[in-house]
């Protein structure tokens, strides 16, 4: 990154040893390493965010190009979306007389059930008379 060779690093170490002394040099080196690590982490995060943003922008441009080729624009999509009913609108549009299917099945017998019940009663009555 900085293209620092071994000789430059040795020179920096000797100057640091003379200026800071042998007691404070390890602490300063540790702190400096910590801050360099944080700076690298921040730069890597920034780099990944920029790459992600570039990819997102590229995908957005591709999608818009495909929509233009298909003859779709944002207004027609928005109109189609607005024409669809939301679940809340569907629930509000139901009248109280509309019953759920399970309630209708539990409370009312179907006509075929009534017919079969009448037929069974008629068969039992005819057997009693015989």
UniProtKB/Swiss-Prot annotation:
GO CC annotation: TAT protein transport complex
Alphabetic keyword roster: Cell inner membrane, Cell membrane, Membrane, Protein transport, Translocation, Transmembrane, Transmembrane helix, Transport
Location in the cell: Cell inner membrane
Segments of this protein annotated with the region Disordered: 57-130
Function as written in the Swiss-Prot or TrEMBL entry: Part of the twin-arginine translocation (Tat) system that transports large folded proteins containing a characteristic twin-arginine motif in their signal peptide across membranes. Together with TatC, TatB is part of a receptor directly interacting with Tat signal peptides. TatB may form an oligomeric binding site that transiently accommodates folded Tat precursor proteins before their translocation.
The protein, known as: Sec-independent protein translocase protein TatB
Entry keyword annotation includes Cell inner membrane: yes
Skewed-composition ranges (Basic and acidic residues): 57-67, 111-130
Membrane topology per record: Single-pass membrane protein
Entry annotated with the keyword Lyase: no
Molecular function GO terms recorded: protein transmembrane transporter activity
InterPro entries: TatA/B/E, TatB
UniProt source species: Alcanivorax borkumensis (strain ATCC 700651 / DSM 11573 / NCIMB 13689 / SK2)
